Amino acid sequence: VKTEFSDGKGAFQVEGVAGNRYLLSVAAVGFGRYWTSVFETPATGVALPVIQLAPHQTAQLKEVLVEGRKPPYEHYPDRTVVNVADSPLSAGATTLEVLGRSPGVTTDASDNLSLRGRQGVLVFIDGKRVPLTGNELADYLRALPADQVQSLALITSPPASYDAQGVAGVIAISLKKDQRLGTNGSINGSYGRGEFGKFTGGLSLNHRRKNLNIYGNYAYTDRQGFTRLDFQRYFLATPQLPAASSVQYNDQRTHLRSHTGKVGLDLTLNKRTLLGASVSGLASRNLTETQSNAQFQENASQLATFYTSLAAQDIKRPNSSANLNLRHAFADSASAASLTLDADYARYHTTRLLGLYTYYNAPFRPTNLLSGDQRSNLDIGALKADFSQPLPHRARLEAGAKVTRVTATNDVAFANTVDGMTTTDQNISSQFQYYENVNAAYVNLVGTWAGTKLQAGLRAEQTNTRAETADSTSREWHYLKLFPSLLLQRTLSKAHTLTLLVARRIERPAYGQINPLRAYFDATSYQAGNPELVAATSYNFELSHTYKQKFSTALAYARTDQPIVNVVQPSPDGGRVVVNRNVNLATQHFYTLTLTAPLELTKWWTLYANGLFYYNRYAGTLAGTSLDRGGFATNLTLNNSFVLPGDWVAEVNAFYESREVFQFQVIQPRGQVTVGVQKSLLGKQASLRLNVSDVFYTVPTHVTSTYDNFTEAYFRRDDTRVITASFTYRFGNGKVAAARKRAAGAEEELRRAASQ
């Protein structure tokens, strides 16, 4: 029914098992297993007498090897956990690709992540918030190899100990950590081939003694690929310009190289106090070359205009972070109060160089070179304290506070070269600065009484932001908001459990969404932030039923005021250039039904099925276009796991996304099938994995956006069908020790929430 671990003195506590008859089994390495007689657990709980284990009589115990394989997916009332490390499908993949195959996770044409059909997702990596959105976040996750990831937690209703940011929820990414005693490590390498090659290699080392643990890891990625983009655009007539249309074909080559690393130590100062420190970094360089061929037709009576553009971009992103944390228990027992302190600093730097050549077929339109040099820095500092106090009757009170400060600077210079003459383009060259301070405090009560589990919390966040441009234009926001959260779970019988989830959350505009400076894709398309964006707030409600602790049915509703959405519109500069940016609409109403079924079809075949059926309705106005429409959509995920003879493991993953009406867009259906096998070698110290992603090449993106003044049909295909081979070798001591949790930023609160 349940498994728990004792503390250092052998004390343990098992929650959520009231009102039934049980047997208790106790085991420890070097001792014989102990079984109690049958006993009942009343609503008030039961205290067992002292249990003594008898040592084994074996004169010498050489080695005990404990083997186990986690299921690919684990479902809980407020989250789904994706166990990435043991999956043959993760070999050679990126973290973004693994997310795209996870139940309920999708990406749109602009690389915005959605969780259960809703945008506005907050991403953590080892407890550190990633302050990026859109294609910047997608590029970051592309640069992070999936071989370094242990698990993903898709949390739709986080407790009060989490930041309130993210109206759709939280994606918590946990990286691998070695828990073995002594000196241990692993080496891995993979090579994949689609139309272009993809290489990943890595090394991890860990030295653990009684009071000290030193660890480090490094990974290098070299991935080449392509993207094909086709656009059909229709511009309606305005008082300034006649109606027009264009057809554009883009062929893009990409070359991404990244270095990922982390070093740290955990030090046991005494039996109650643990100190940890770590430094990590992810440095990437992405080279892209894009050739665009386009045809413009102003109206039927004029000749068409043709142009070809060549765009070369060199984007460098050296990112680094540091963490110092301390955990102290105020007594030696498992019921002692504890305090965790964290200090974090992170720096995200971006250099973006652009060279955009445009050649026209018209003699009166000379060749033009647009060159750009954009440099940005994002500095984040955070201090955090979490206190936990166990209470009588198996309850616990938690409280904490957090202070975060963000400083962002951006400087971009564009120059035009025509007929050999170069001039600075002052209209699109500028500087931008952004400051943000969030002060937060929370209280959370957790307890189980007579078959009812309660988790009730309240979080307060006070936000102060200021945005400044080069012309001294400044905007400030100051506000205080409260964010209640509730998890109420009632065990009706051995087979039936009901859970109610309620939460209020916020979506503050990210720095990149406010930054008005431009990033050009080609001669007719650029991306820019919107300084007029305001924060969105959401009220989320969910009622779920679980049958036999496996089969889950959930009904949910969410209302979001002033939701932030991504749109494509003609540039305010005029002409036939379009801008990709974010705007606020009035409201979003979201209704969803989620069905989850983990099925053990045979001893060697396990099927995890997840069905998401939802209705999404938006209301608002943009560029004279009134919007009040919605549509039904479906997202299906099937994952088959096979444990085969001869130490073989196989997986087949398939997902399907139906046609969807989303904001101003109509998104066509798509799907993907990925297969993989894994073989253990060298006495299970090594493994060989082989997988093929997007077997049937069925995951293109086809979107039509319709406004009163503009229509765009968009088609995108990437280098997604890839065959990959991977080899991993593990060396060192096989004995496992209890790992010290490296609490970085919010990592301790993530761990604590996941155990509830």
At which residue positions do the language-model features occur?
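Short, acidic Ser/Thr/Gly-rich low-complexity loop/linker segments typical of extracellular
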Residues: 1-11
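Short, acidic, small-residue-rich periplasmic hinge/interaction motif at the N-terminus
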Residues: 25-31, 45-89, 108-110, 116-120, ...
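N-terminal periplasmic accessory domains that precede
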Residues: 47-52, 95-98, 137-140, 154, ...
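Extracytoplasmic beta-strand/coil segments of soluble accessory domains associated
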Residues: 96-133
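Short acidic/polar hinge/loop motifs at secondary-structure boundaries
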Residues: 128-156
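Face-selective signature of the C-terminal outer-membrane beta-barrel domain
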Residues: 260-284, 309-468, 550-554, 589-614, ...
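Outer membrane beta-barrel strand-and-loop segments of large Gram-negative receptors
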Residues: 371, 380-384, 423-430, 534, ...
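Surface-exposed extracellular loop regions of Gram-negative outer-membrane beta-barrel proteins
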Residues: 464-465, 494-540, 555-575, 695-708
